């Protein structure tokens, strides 16, 4: 009996201690969670963790990285990196009448065209990029894909950090999360395709943010040998009169181009000349180059609108071309529209040496004037969005937040007043937020695949990029009514 009482007493004491410890732990936990900064930190970590998990869980799927991976493997084997001859073969069969456009949707012809186009120009980057990926090409595809996605994600976080520094929002986690949510469709699509865009954005931002000219040139040249579009940012160095940075960019570009010669000199030279001939001399000069439904660049949009052979699988099905013109006329239209877009940049931004606006415009140009701009390419809107969001955020801090703290009306009334106030005093911010929300809602899961197909064929994302470009120009001219005019100078 005594033993039983002792045992029961020990258990009771243990339970009391356990309950007491749990109570103290719960109180401490609640005190921490009541802290606003802790909530924000937990939410931010959870957001980026989910974003990373979403990407890494799909790393084993077929994606654009497979093209990089296969090209890297072919580099080690000495096999040709490029395979664009199908374009000439398809056009020859269409022009000779062997394949008739009106029979494009018959089962036999459709499957024939689909098989010919699936591997079409899968790798169009310079040989250096394939060479740089050789270390991870020795791993199985799934492992290599996960490594590349992780590097991409780290570059994405690095880009957000540089953005926070340039806009004096270091440690402002909510700003970064909102910026990501507004661009979530592009970020998610980029991860699903395991593309190289995040690395390019980081290299570009790091190059323009660094004060050392040799380091800026080194970083920008690396981005340039991966993809040509970062070459537009040489204009940023020119605007800032950083002529040494331009010189170092040129020198290091040559260094990166000839670096693979240490591994396979004759093969590197052969592939570099092949890339120049196939990509630069032939295909990128033609508006027909991969002008498919999902290609949202200016060049591809004009081809879809006015050239009958631009996207033979989708044009007739969706009511295109709108008007049949010759390729020469379409090229002329491209030149005219390019001038219309570029002149305001040089007149309003470049001449006035506004650093942030210039960067934002160049990121937009990297999408618009690229020969190929799939949905994932629009992650380049991250920086233009940051400029416009910073403006809207500052306006909200000055004019909206004090009202919310002082007013006791209902949530709906305060929200309606805030929208009216933004529209009345800062139309640039209002248009930016409205446009970003609209693009966010134009998702297949919301609007359906049929409507999304029609929007993609019309290149609605191209118009959204141009819309942001116009807002950047107006942001220079018009300041919010409640804020004094000032220059953004982060140098």
Where are these regions (language model features)?
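Aromatic-enriched
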Residues: 387-398, 407-409, 413, 419-491
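Start-transfer (signal-anchor) and selected internal transmembrane alpha helices
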Residues: 1-7, 12-55, 168, 470-491
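Membrane-embedded alpha-helical segments of multi-pass membrane proteins
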Residues: 150-155, 195-203, 223-229, 250, ...
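Membrane helix-loop boundary segments at the extracytoplasmic
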Residues: 189, 197, 369-381, 440-460
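A cross-taxon signal for low-complexity, glycine/charged-rich
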Residues: 3-8, 14, 19, 23, ...
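Membrane-interface alpha helices of multi-pass inner-membrane proteins
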Residues: 215-238, 361-369
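Primarily membrane-embedded glycan-assembly and transfer machineries that use lipid-linked glycans
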Residues: 24-216, 243-358, 362-375
């Amino acid at each position: 009996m005594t033993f039983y009482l002792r045992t029961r007493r020990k258990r009771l004491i243990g339970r009391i201690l356990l309950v007491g410890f749990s109570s103290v732990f719960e109180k401490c936990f609640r005190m921490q969670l009541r802290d606003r900064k802790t909530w924000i930190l937990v939410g931010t970590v959870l957001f980026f963790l989910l974003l990373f998990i979403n990407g890494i869980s799909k790393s084993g799927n077929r994606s654009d990285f497979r093209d990089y991976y296969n090209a890297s493997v072919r580099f080690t084997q000495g096999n040709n990196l490029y395979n664009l001859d199908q374009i000439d073969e398809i056009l020859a069969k269409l022009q000779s009448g062997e394949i008739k456009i009106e029979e494009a949707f018959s089962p036999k012809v459709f499957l024939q065209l689909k098989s010919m186009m699936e591997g079409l120009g899968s790798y169009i980057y310079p040989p250096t990029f394939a060479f740089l990926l050789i270390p991870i090409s020795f791993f199985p595809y799934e492992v290599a894909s996960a490594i590349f996605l992780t590097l991409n994600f780290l570059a994405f976080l690095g880009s957000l950090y540089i953005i926070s520094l340039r806009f004096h929002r270091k440690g402002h986690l909510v700003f970064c999360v909102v910026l990501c949510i507004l661009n979530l469709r592009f970020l998610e699509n980029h991860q699903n395709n395991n593309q190289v865009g995040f690395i390019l954005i980081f290299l570009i931002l790091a190059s323009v943010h660094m004060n050392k000219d040799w380091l800026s040139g080194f970083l920008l040249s690396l981005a340039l040998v991966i993809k040509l579009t970062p070459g537009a940012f040489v204009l940023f160095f020119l605007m800032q009169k950083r002529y040494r940075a331009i010189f170092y960019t040129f020198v290091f570009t040559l260094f990166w181009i000839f670096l693979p010669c240490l591994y396979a000199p004759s093969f590197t030279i052969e592939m570099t000349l092949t890339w120049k001939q196939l990509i630069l001399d032939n295909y990128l000069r033609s508006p027909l180059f991969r002008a498919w439904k999902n290609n949202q660049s200016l060049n591809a949009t004009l081809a879809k609108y006015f050239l009958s052979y631009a996207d033979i699988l989708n044009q007739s099905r969706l009511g295109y071309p709108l008007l049949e013109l010759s390729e020469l006329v379409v090229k002329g239209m491209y030149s005219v529209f390019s001038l219309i877009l570029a002149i305001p940049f040089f007149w309003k931004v470049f001449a006035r040496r506004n650093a942030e606006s210039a960067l934002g415009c160049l990121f937009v140009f990297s999408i618009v004037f690229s020969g190929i701009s799939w949905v994932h390419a629009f992650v380049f809107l991250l920086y233009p969005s940051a400029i416009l969001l910073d403006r809207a955020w500052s306006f909200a801090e000055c004019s909206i937040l004090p009202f919310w703290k002082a007013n006791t009306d209902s949530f709906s009334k305060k929200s309606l007043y805030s929208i009216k106030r933004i529209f009345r005093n800062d139309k640039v911010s209002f248009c930016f937020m409205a446009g970003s929300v609209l693009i966010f809602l134009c998702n297949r899961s919301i609007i359906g695949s049929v409507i999304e197909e029609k929007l993609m064929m019309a290149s609605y994302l191209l118009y959204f990029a141009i819309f942001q470009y116009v807002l950047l120009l107006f942001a220079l001219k018009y300041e919010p009514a409640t804020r004094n005019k000032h220059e953004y100078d982060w140098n």
